[in-house]
Regions:
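Active-site neighborhoods and metal-handling regions in enzymes and metal-associated proteins
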Residues: 1-252
Length: 252
């Protein structure tokens, strides 16, 4: 969406604060021995307490309030009472919601307990690339050039990107134009970032895989070549200078 009034800005900031706080609290709530279903139920309770609706459940009938992906899962992981969190697990929580007609989206990957499997470099790289690349966005920048810069930075860290997952426009629905803000160059995409537009910027930084494939459950995405992926995501407002990070309350 494009924000043209103070009321629209306030609406977007409110829903962004909600998803950001829910994400931050879910991260703090995460404990060894907990199931991902318990964690998701907690997230659902928080969303309800704010008067917000889970975006994936409301829009796509996703079987969970939030997407919780574990270890080799990249995205859209289904919360389950059979998935018990263990020391060193790589977990990703993605929280998106609707409040008063406005939608926002954010996510983070982190390590459960101690980093016994050496995931810290991947997680830190994903987070740092997100913040660094967001700060570079200006109106008129080609989205393809932005994606190219993400992949370049990932490669400089000895890592890859997932090339068929993307950030997207957001605001009056969960997914809006621009539909594909990829983590790589797409020469066929001539679209540019627009002043006052709201977009969700997502990193999908990978150790081995370059593409996501869907499991038989119809939701869960994994890498085509194994390995691990870290995802970090903010919803931002593009301004004449540095973008405003609407979901900054998640503290990722």
């Amino acid at each position: 969406m494009s924000i043209n009034t103070e009321e629209e800005f306030i609406g977007m900031q409110k829903v962004s604060d909600v998803v950001a706080v829910v994400l931050r609290k879910m991260k703090s709530y995460t404990k060894i021995g907990m199931t991902t279903k318990e964690l998701d139920d907690y997230g659902g309770e928080l969303l309800t307490s704010f008067g917000a609706k889970s975006a994936p459940k409301h829009t796509y009938e996703f079987p969970g309030f939030t997407c919780i992906s574990l270890n080799h899962e990249i995205a859209h992981g289904i919360p389950s009472d059979k998935k018990v969190l263990k020391e060193g697990d790589l977990i990703n929580i993605d929280v998106s919601a609707e409040l008063n007609g406005f939608w926002s989206d954010n996510g983070t990957s982190f390590i459960v307990g101690r980093d016994i499997h050496g995931h810290k470099r991947l997680v830190d790289s994903s987070r740092n690339i997100l913040i660094d690349r967001i700060s570079s966005i200006r109106p008129g920048m080609k989205i393809s050039d932005f994606g190219k810069s993400i992949e370049r930075q990932a490669k400089s860290n000895g890592l890859k990107v997932i090339k068929n997952l993307a950030g997207h426009g957001v605001g009056r629905s969960l997914h809006e134009d621009p539909e594909y803000i990829l983590n790589c160059e797409d020469k066929s995409n001539n679209s540019r970032f627009k002043l006052n537009s709201v977009v969700a910027i997502e990193m999908f930084i990978s150790t081995k895989s370059s593409y996501a494939t869907e499991l038989n459950d119809g939701w869960t995405l994994v890498g085509n070549n194994g390995g691990y992926v870290a995802q970090h995501e903010h919803t931002i407002l593009i301004t004449k200078t540095k973008p405003i990070i609407l979901t900054s309350a998640n503290e990722i």
